[in-house]
Swiss-Prot record:
Protein name: Probable 2-phosphosulfolactate phosphatase
Cofactor dependence: Mg(2+)
Catalytic reactions of this protein: (2R)-O-phospho-3-sulfolactate + H2O = (2R)-3-sulfolactate + phosphate
Source organism per UniProt: Clostridium botulinum (strain Kyoto / Type A2)
EC number(s) given by UniProt: 3.1.3.71
Keywords for this protein: Hydrolase, Magnesium
The keyword Cytoplasm is assigned to this record: no
Length: 239
C-alpha cells in the first residue's frame, strides 16, 4: 500500500486523486466536529464552501437543519453552532442534518471530489480509520486541511499517528518522504498536544479560550466511527 500526504487544501491536485482512497484530516476542528456529530446520530453532514450556500440549503430544505461552522475560528453570524465538537451532542444532532462551512476542512473535502473513496479522520477516530483503510486495501492519499492554505503541525502529526495505527495492522506500507516524516515526528512525539502547543492554529484557539475544544480534539480513539463523504454529503461509513 502506497501512502502520500498533501499538506493543505490549497495543495490538492485533483487529477492525482482519481481512483484513490483519500483521508481528510482537520483535527482543529472540522473533522473532529464531523466525526462527533455522526457518532452522536446525526443523519448526515453537508460540507459547503460558503456561508450563502449553507443558508440557501437551510432555507430550501424540508429536513431538520442545523447550521454549523466558523470563519477565523469564530461562530458565523446566524448559525446555530460554531466549529466546536462539544456543541454537537446527541441531544441536538440526533436525526438531523448538519450543514457545515469552515475555513479549511470543508474546503479540503469539496476539493477532493475526484477521489474514489473519501473518509473523514481525526485523532478521535484514527484506529477506526486505519481498520477501514486496511479493508479497502488501496493506495492512500492523506490530505491535511492545513490553516489558510499553509502547512499545519496538528494535521501533520495526526497523519503520522494514522500511519502508525496502520503499521500496527499491516507492514506492507510504502511511504513517500513526507509520509515518512509525519510518521517519524509522531513516533518521537507521542504526547501530541505537548508537541503542537507552539503551533499557530493551536495558539489561535487557545487565545479564544477554547481549551476544552483542544483537550477534546487531542484525545486518541474515543470514537469507533468513520464518516464517509459521497454524493455531496457525509454519513457513517459501512466499510
Amino acid at each position: 500500500m502506497n501512502i502520500d500526504i498533501v499538506i493543505s487544501a490549497d495543495h490538492i491536485d485533483e487529477k492525482r486523486l482519481i481512483n484513490k482512497t483519500v483521508i481528510i484530516i482537520d483535527i482543529l476542528r472540522a473533522t473532529s466536529v464531523i466525526t462527533t456529530a455522526i457518532n452522536n446520530g446525526c443523519k448526515k453532514v453537508i460540507p459547503v464552501l460558503t456561508v450563502e450556500e449553507a443558508k440557501d440549503i437551510a432555507k430550501n430544505s424540508k429536513e431538520d437543519i442545523i447550521l454549523g461552522g466558523e470563519r477565523n475560528a469564530l461562530k458565523i453570524d446566524g448559525f446555530n453552532f460554531s466549529n466546536s465538537p462539544l456543541e454537537y451532542t446527541k441531544k441536538y444532532v440526533e436525526g438531523k442534518t448538519v450543514v457545515l462551512s469552515t475555513t479549511n476542512g470543508t474546503r479540503a473535502i469539496n476539493n477532493s471530489f475526484n477521489a474514489k473513496t473519501i473518509l473523514i479522520s481525526a485523532l478521535i477516530n484514527s484506529k477506526a480509520t486505519a481498520k477501514a483503510i486496511d479493508k479497502l486495501n488501496e493506495d492512500l492519499i492523506i490530505i491535511n486541511s492545513g490553516t489558510n492554505g499553509q502547512f499545519s503541525i496538528d494535521d501533520f502529526i495526526c497523519s503520522g499517528y494514522l500511519i502508525d495505527c496502520l503499521y500496527n495492522i499491516r507492514k506492507d506500507l510504502e511511504l513517500s518522504d513526507i509520509a515518512k516524516t509525519a510518521h517519524y515526528i509522531y513516533t518521537n512525539n507521542k504526547d501530541i498536544e505537548s508537541f503542537v502547543k507552539k503551533a499557530t492554529h493551536y495558539s489561535r484557539l487557545k487565545s479564544l479560550n477554547l481549551e476544552k475544544d483542544l483537550e477534546y480534539c487531542f484525545q486518541k480513539d474515543i470514537i469507533d466511527v468513520v464518516p464517509q463523504y459521497k454524493d455531496g454529503y457525509i454519513i457513517k461509513s459501512n466499510i
